[in-house]
């Protein structure tokens, strides 16, 4: 999670 997105 990066600032509420980017879940890799």
Curated annotation (Swiss-Prot):
One of its GO terms (cellular component) is extracellular region. GO terms for molecular function: hormone activity. The modification Phenylalanine amide is found at residue 8. It comes from the Eukaryota. It is found in: Secreted. Keywords: Amidation, Hormone, Secreted, Sulfation. Its main location: secreted. The modification Sulfotyrosine is found at residue 2. InterPro entries: Gastrin/cholecystokinin_CS. Binds to CCK-A receptors in the pancreas and CCK-B receptors in the brain. Belongs to the gastrin/cholecystokinin family. This peptide hormone induces gall bladder contraction and the release of pancreatic enzymes in the gut. Its function in the brain is not clear. Binding to CCK-A receptors stimulates amylase release from the pancreas, binding to CCK-B receptors stimulates gastric acid secretion. This is Cholecystokinin. It comes from Macropus giganteus (Eastern gray kangaroo). The lineage of its organism: Eukaryota, Metazoa, Chordata, Craniata, Vertebrata.
């Amino acid at each position: 999670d990066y600032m509420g997105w980017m879940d890799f």
